Amino acid sequence: MENIQTKQYPCFKRWSRKNWSVFASLHRYVTIGVLSVGMSILLLATQGASAQTADTTAVLKTLRIREVGVTGSQTAPARNAQSHTPLFDRKAQAPAPVQTLEAALRLAPSVDVRERGGKGTQADIFIRGGSFDQTMVLLNGIDFTDARTGHQSHALPVDLDCISAVELIDGVPGVGAYAGAVNIRTAPLRPTYLRLEASGGQYGYGYGNLSGAVSAGRFSVLGAASYRRSDGYRHNTDFSNYNAFVRATYDGGRAGFFDLQAGWQDRDFGSNGFYAAYNPDQWEHTATALGSLRWLKTAGRFSLGAAASYRKNFDRYDWTRGTAMNRHNTDNVGAKLWADCDWAAGVTTVGGDYAFNHIYSTNLGDKLSVPEGHYTHAKARHTGNLWLRHAKRWRHFDAAASAGVSLTPYGTSALWSLSAGYAPAAGLRLEAGAWQSMRLPTFTDLYYTSPAQINNLDLTPEHAVTYRLGMDYLKRSWNLSAQAYYRSGRDIIDWVWREDMGSKWHSEQ
């Protein structure tokens, strides 16, 4: 060991993607041999780094350090993000006997996953007392939340073997993440592989999955397809589910970094008691197609990023199986543009995002003068956010603030967030933050009417201010985390039983 020269361990001093501050908080030198683009930008499998020949470093000691999420502003879901709480990690939870994402998320104390049926047939995600409609759902940092109902937001065409991690993101101000955001990250099991899985069980259960990945130079692709079905464990609980997903990345050098993902899902399921406990004969069929393209470019202290996304969702709901009651055709389009500048006073980010939501339906939206096929109603809306964020880090202290505006059909609202962190000793970090968030009424909140429900066109956005205090302590093999939250909300939307309206449910605030 005494013959090893100091020059063999290059000390980490700066990362061109700016968010090197997470390493600075460790108060240790970080030795890195090869840092792959996949790890630094997209948090893909870290095998890309280990596969290289690290001939410029010598490994002297293996240290367990605090787990950090390397997320620069280019991967932030929207506006600003204050903290990332791991909900699922592929390596850490590999021994856990889980077969679906829903089963894995049930192990996390910060979220409440409520399933209808088995094997992820239909599930809702609740964050810290919020509703499923108040949860933003992201896939690799791209917002694919459904504007019609939160019941559909979680229906993403990815299986557990493609998911490397799931994280809870706090501190996203503005429209969308009223209670928080759940970000699902995909990555291959290894740089190049082909995997086949098949299983079966009682009640006609069967599952088949084919997945694989290829990496060649600056290009990598991950693909997967699966089929899951069952005859059901009781009357009208059968289901079938098809998934297909592909993600490709390419480092174009001066042209920038490109990240493309696309997926398709088709599922139908008997809905015995799903939406009305007294009706065992409900049935639903949904089909989802989604895709996104993200571009990242760095030039010196400046960086620029852009993303575009699209999600289409079809839904057919039968109150009595075989007799169509509701049909919906939803389009969700998103675009985002942001720029960073790393200068002496910190990192400044300016950006904006835009969302377009449109629905054709048999009963949601304004009545059409001329029907479009089965659809007699339609509605569209545009929303956007503009924001400015600045962050600064010192040796033991860091702070960030953001401000901007949300533009919605209901008017203009201010958005803001504040956060600070302090590391008084090695392994100990204290955090505090506050942010404003809001949620627009879904198309279901506004328009849904049935023999048991009455809609409300006078609904307005929900608003909340959330406060957070946190502490994290790591020493050797021990890790202790504690967090306290307080959310002050107003104009909360819920369905209320009204006897004066004919004993029906009414959407109110």
Outline where the language-model segments fall.
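N-terminal periplasmic "start-of-domain" segments of outer-membrane beta-barrel proteins
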Residues: T62, R66-Q99, A123-D124, F132, ...
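Extracytoplasmic beta-strand/coil segments of soluble accessory domains associated
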Residues: E102-I142, S164, G171
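Short acidic/polar hinge/loop motifs at secondary-structure boundaries
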Residues: I142-G171, R185
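Short strand-turn segments of transmembrane beta-barrel domains in outer membranes
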Residues: A165, P173, G180-V214, A225, ...
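Transmembrane beta-barrel strands of outer-membrane/channel proteins
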Residues: L196-G200, G223-Y227, L260-W264, A306-K312, ...
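Surface-exposed extracellular loop regions of Gram-negative outer-membrane beta-barrel proteins
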Residues: A213-R229, G305-D318, T349, T362, ...
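Flexible loop and strand-edge segments within Gram-negative outer membrane beta-barrel domains
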Residues: S230-N241, D251, A255-N332
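Outer-membrane beta-barrel signature, preferentially recognizing the C-terminal barrel domain
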Residues: Y275-T298, A423, R429, Q436-R490, ...
